[in-house]
């Protein structure tokens, strides 16, 4: 069974994550990266929406059990590959030549929230789900590249509160700070609002892509500098005290 699928609604592509909590591992990163390439090859696509079909979750972030299992086996390469491939996904989303919208239908934690920040716009349900950066509670600080682009989506004074407390935020709270475009009443409102908004964004790929390259030039440099070589030790990303 696929972990994500995509369909077209007129000129809007909709990626739907279909793997429950949609935990992110190497398979997730490779699948999403390939799907982004497949979608953008369709010249009729003018916008992209990313969402989930799970009743509770958008994405619960990194597949920690998968990472811990590989670390216990001293099998660092798949995890290193995942981190680099996920950074590649972030770069693709940042530079995607059509607008990218996250339709957050449920919990977005850790890398799930971070991925939504790589998108251009965010919509979220008011009746279900929290948005949270729990890294401070599990001993995994944001990587440099993540910090570089999350700041485009969240004002720094709010981001510092979110990172340092690990608190959970609702859609109305995010809307208040313009982190999301709209706090939607329910699932139907979420998708209707995101799709209607996406269909207003009939922009030429050339100019939009160039604007993104210039706007995020410094961010991409930081992401590139974050590349993990094969010799990197994954446990160096975690802090115990």
Question: How would you label these PLM feature ranges?
Answer:
Residues 124-125, 175-226:
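C-terminal long alpha-helix characteristic of the crotonase
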Residues 85-137:
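Glycine-rich beta-to-alpha active-site loop
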Residues 1-51:
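Conserved CoA-thioester-binding segment of acyl-CoA-metabolizing enzymes
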Residues 52-88:
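Glycine- (often His-adjacent) and acidic-residue-rich active-site loop
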Residues 121, 161, 165-167, 182:
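Well-ordered beta-strand positions
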Residues 50, 115-116, 174, 194:
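Hydrophobic/aromatic residues within transmembrane alpha-helices
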Residues 15, 31-32, 50, 63, ...:
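Terminal peptide-recognition signature
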